[in-house]
Structure formats: C-alpha cells, structure tokens
Swiss-Prot record:
Its main location: cytoplasm. Belongs to the prokaryotic/mitochondrial release factor family. The modification N5-methylglutamine is found at Q249. This is Peptide chain release factor 2. InterPro entries: PCRF (IPR005139), Pep_chain_release_fac_I (IPR000352), Pep_chain_release_fac_I_sf (IPR045853), PrfB (IPR004374). It is found in: Cytoplasm. GO terms for molecular function: translation release factor activity, codon specific.
Amino acid sequence: MIDYELKQRIDEVKKRYEDIVKVFHPEDKKKELEELEKLMGESDFWNDQKRAKEISQNAQRIRKIIDDMVDIENKLEDLEAGLELLEEDATFLDTIKQLIDDIERKVKTFELELILNEKFDSSNAYLSIHPGAGGTESQDWASMLLRMYMRWAERRGFDVQIVDYQPGEEAGIKSAMLYIKGEYVYGYLKYERGVHRLVRISPFDANKRRHTSFASVNVMPEIEDDIDVEINPEDLRIDTYRASGAGGQYVNKTESAVRITHIPTGIVVTCQTERSQLQNKETAMKVLKARLYQLELEKRQKQLEEIQGELKDISWGNQIRSYVFQPYTMVKDHRTNVETGNIDAVMDGDIDIFIESELIFFAKSKNKK
C-alpha cells in the first residue's frame, strides 16, 4: 500500500507527461521525422549545405525527443507493473520510490528540452557584466556575479573563458565578458539578462552600514558563420594594448589585447584572453558580429523579448533578482517569485532553481499570448 504523498507524486508526474503529449503530438512528429529522413536520403541532399545542416539538426532533435518519450512511457509501464507487485510484496516500495524519482527527473529534463526550441537556444553564449552606480561596492558585486556564472558553467560541465576583463580601481571589476561553450548554453542563460541587486553590510564601509548595489547582466548567442552579418572593414577602428586585470589563468597579460570600434554604431568590443593579437582579433570580431546581429534584431522587432528581453536602467525598481545578505539571507527572483535562503550555494553557482523556473515561466507566458 502506498501512502498519500507518494500517490500524489505519481498522479502529478503522469499528468505532466500527459500535458507534454497534448502539446507535442508524438504521432505527428513521427510522421515529420519520416519526411525529413526521406529528404536526407535523396541523392542531391548535400548540394545545399546550409539547408542540409538545418534539416539534419531538426531530424536529430525530433528523433531524440521521440526516443525520450518512449523511454518515459516504458518507465511509466514499469511503474504500473511495480504498483501491482507492491500489493503482494511490500519490499517493492523502495524500488517504486526510485522509479518515481527517475521518472520525475526525466520528465523535468524533457519539459526543459521542449522549451529550448527557439532559434538560438542551442548556441554558445557571451555573457557580460557591468556594475551600476556605487563605485567600489557595485564593482565588487559585479565580480561576485562573474564568479557565480563561472561556477555555474563549471558545474554544468561547460567550457568557460574570460574574453574581456576590466578591473576596478580598488576591488571588483568595471566590466567583464565570458564566452561559455556547451549544449543549449544560450537557451539556459537568456533570461538571466537584466539587473541584479545586492543588499549587504559593505566591507568597504568603515561604519558597517548596509548598502544596496546593482549590476547588469547581458547575454548574447554566438552567431554561426553561416548567418550573414555584413561588416565593412572600412567601418572598423582596431587598437591594440596590454591586457590588464586579475583574471587568473583565464586572462592573458601580454601586449596582445585588441579593441575594435564599429564606427557607424559606436559599438566597442575588446578581447584580451588569447595568446596573440590575431587570435584576440578573431574573438573580438565574433563578439562584434553577435552585437551587430543583436542590434539588427532589435531594429526589426518591437518585442525585444523575442531574443533576450528588455535591459532596463541599472537602478532601484528595475531588478530581476535580489540577493540579500543582511539582515537575513535570501535570493529572490522578482519575475517568478522563486526564492531560497541558501545564498552561499547560489553565489557558488547553484542557480538552476532560478534558470529552470524562468524557462517554464516565460514559456507559459508566451503560450497565453
């Protein structure tokens, strides 16, 4: 006999999977996969490399989702069989609990994979951080956020590299940019864009007063080479300088740093990570391409949320998330209302609770429109 709480979990995970089936229509997707596989089998399929790549990637994604659904359905069948055996043998209870844990985990992962279906969700990402007004305190907060996102990427097994790092005068950073490489990095991070607020007793205040600081986070997808972004070399001013800052093993400190200014738009990008000017220039050009593509999308679309939401002033009232160290400890996302008191874990990169809730929240918001 199972208890009420366990029965609730079983009913809930079944309903979540039924909701997925209603949205996804697996039989229709199986037919779509068959059509794509027919196209891929044609003799002239690879004549158009760009089209072939898009079709292959789409087929691969649909095939994975279908396989995942079959796996979940098989485990649900195992669960039903296990529940029948449980009526005769109570020792099956631990097996049932483990099976429910496994199904819940797979359904949750599957829900997120279905949500991450927009154009750039599977891309690598550039994440930049800028402190708001407040001098050293805000600059220190920006460096804390930098570490948080680096730890998150490392926890996830993603490759992370500091592309640009401008140190603060006393502590912290004036700005920094990360390049994070891995599957669905941009999709996971895209809603982290916005203003992040810190409340703490400042270590830089001799009177030990409580301070509120702000820093902004921007996230851009890496733009692949097959996406056309026209950059006229005559529109560029390229400067070189010595890299600076305490970026540890992530930052190069030779005379190879590169700054590229796109004169028509005033966009400035810098890179100081690589070991040569040529490599830094190549990386900076990739960042510039992403910035220009982002700018073009913003011109075309009134709803900036289509790619990354609206970045507001770095000030009170515009924050997406608050991190409170004193007089109590709490991290709260003001969009989803998700919160936790374990601020040390959050600052050490444990932010999936916020990322996952953001994805579900905004997916539901879009479905209502």
